[in-house]
Amino acid sequence: MSNYLPTDYQTFIATSRYARWLDKQKRRENWGETVSRYIENVVATVVRDEIVLDEVEQAILNLEVMPSMRSVMTAGPAAERDNTCMYNCSFLPVDDVKSFDEAMFILLCGTGVGFSVERQYVTKL
């Protein structure tokens, strides 16, 4: 499969939402480069088998499987700094005043926060 997506709409979404700016080339990543960044920064950290890595990369390039697109978007320096940005949602009980600063931090990372204000938790405040 080429480094490009089959339709203009897919290309627009991938470029506008997931492709990183490449300073040296003065352009955004193409689909193949975006997938490679994801493979190198996320998948290769847990999978060491080159054959499996290549198979996963080809499956993503061929649109046979899709990873978490938030992980695709943040793979690299952002996720290395704090992997909270790779999650779509999180949850915490409001049982300590620190719950509020944790919720704010998680939200600032771009992750949604669900919370519980059940009696057994809020009585601990």
Can you describe what each PLM-predicted range is?
Residues M1-L125:
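Extended catalytic cores of very large enzyme megasubunits
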